[in-house]
Amino acid sequence: MLKWPIPGQVALFQILRCRGNSRRTTVTSLTVSQVGQNFTFVLTDIDSKQRFGFCRLSSGAKSCFCILSYLPWFEVFYKLLNILADYTTKRQENQWNELLETLHKLPIPDPGVSVHLSVHSYFTVPDTRELPSIPENRNLTEYFVAVDVNNMLHLYASMLYERRILIICSKLSTLTACIHGSAAMLYPMYWQHVYIPVLPPHLLDYCCAPMPYLIGIHLSLMEKVRNMALDDVVILNVDTNTLETPFDDLQSLPNDVISSLKNRLKKVSTTTGDGVARAFLKAQAAFFGSYRNALKIEPEEPITFCEEAFVSHYRSGAMRQFLQNATQLQLFKQFIDGRLDLLNSGEGFSDVFEEEINMGEYAGSDKLYHQWLSTVRKGSGAILNTVKTKANPAMKTVYKFAKDHAKMGIKEVKNRLKQKDIAENGCAPTPEEQLPKTAPSPLVEAKDPKLREDRRPITVHFGQAL
């Protein structure tokens, strides 16, 4: 394996070479018929920070180009990988070295800045705080093209209930894009559990893990997975556009919110822009936008969150039941903890989610939140103008993304698999070993496959040069 180190800066370049059945390169040994596939794996460290492995695998090649980075710049790194592959094909070693040397010396630039690495190589630094748009965002575009609206809604509901989810596909690029694209629709929340965009063959036992997960499986491995003891697993087959689930999660969500989301998705199915992401953002705001009404503010005391006030804010029984379950979910708990940290530090926050709350009918009379704003403006804490008038440093935004995106480290999976084996052999775990459960659903029902919807206008745009 050849490494091109870029310490503390943008990325680490590697060439992964396939050597028989070596576990370190198993992910690159899957059979593919497509020429020049781009895909992504994720490494989660002991601090639960994610490092992305952006890869380019050519058909029949014995090596895979890989860029490792904490920066979620999918389009940028895929573009650079394609340029490097082109240099390799044309044997342009000087240009190859020039690009990597420039990248090596490059400090992390601010969002929106144009970066020139060589005469023909440049990119614009993405702003991860903006909503992803079609066709610019490759992950969302591939996900929206491959999966119909009905199955997108079912998968969204399954993620809200923190289920065990497997996504299956024969094409690595589409597989990992669907994993990243679907998870992005949870914004401003992030998937907090096991997150593996493409699972190597020697780690298939992870599919039997007793905790929530979001895992991508190459189709060639699915026969082995089917022979495993899969309990309460949601399976989306991207190739056939079919979804299997033992739960009734979508029907248990408030119907008015889901109906509005479905209608918005159908309206934007033949258009470009951030319409898809904004449709999900509006749904998230409808579900969770009243959290500001549940903030408890007392003089000289830290701001806290009252779950009872949050749930009782709604008259609808369906919404109350959903929110009662939601308050026990890790993705919601981490979201609230993050907001409280910012409020209590006096830093505040301003993002597209808060903007959506302010514009929508779900804002209500969040007097406590505005009381905090008034107090801050009078001088008891830092003022919000640093958030409203200045872009946050790129590294702060990115590292927060990496940390929030997966709080549960992969390290815990093996321990919990061992606990599951002990329990199955007749030894009940102690109370301290009890695992977090996924949210309950009132009914259990298998879902019928739905036909794929036609999105030719989107596919026409997808695939254009960056």
Predicted regions and their residues:
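Acidic, Ser/Thr/Pro/Gly-enriched alpha-helical scaffold modules and adjacent low-complexity linkers
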Residues: 2-418, 422-456, 460-463
